[in-house]
Amino acid sequence: MGILEQLELDYELEEIERFLYFFRSLCDVLEPLIVKLSSDSLKYKEALKDLEQNIHNVVWAAKRLNLDEIANFCTFCEEIMQEAAKFDGPASDEFVDWMFLVGEQLDRYCSDYEKNVSFLSVFNPQIANVPDRISK
């Protein structure tokens, strides 16, 4: 039984669809927002706000379905976005590279649900190495 099928047994379809919608929406905007982080100070702040809001939506939906691994990872990402918001920007190259790793992980997780695989993809341990320099 796949992870999506298990959710369908335990939760209302509307809740699952909302989670998948928020998750896919986040993954669809991640790359352009990450690129925007490195543009200038104004775009940096806008991108962080959009990222934080999209991530927050996934956290909310994942918690409603008791998807702790997704909720915890996205909460971690949300906290990093809040920390990054303390800087003026633009983002450092190291932070942009790290954000692309995060984006790849989120996209893998989202695809896992969409493809109804048996287990979530393995977590990339490099993500635990948050760069020291967030802003240039």
Predicted regions mapped to residue ranges:
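Non-catalytic helical tethers at domain boundaries
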Residues: 1-136
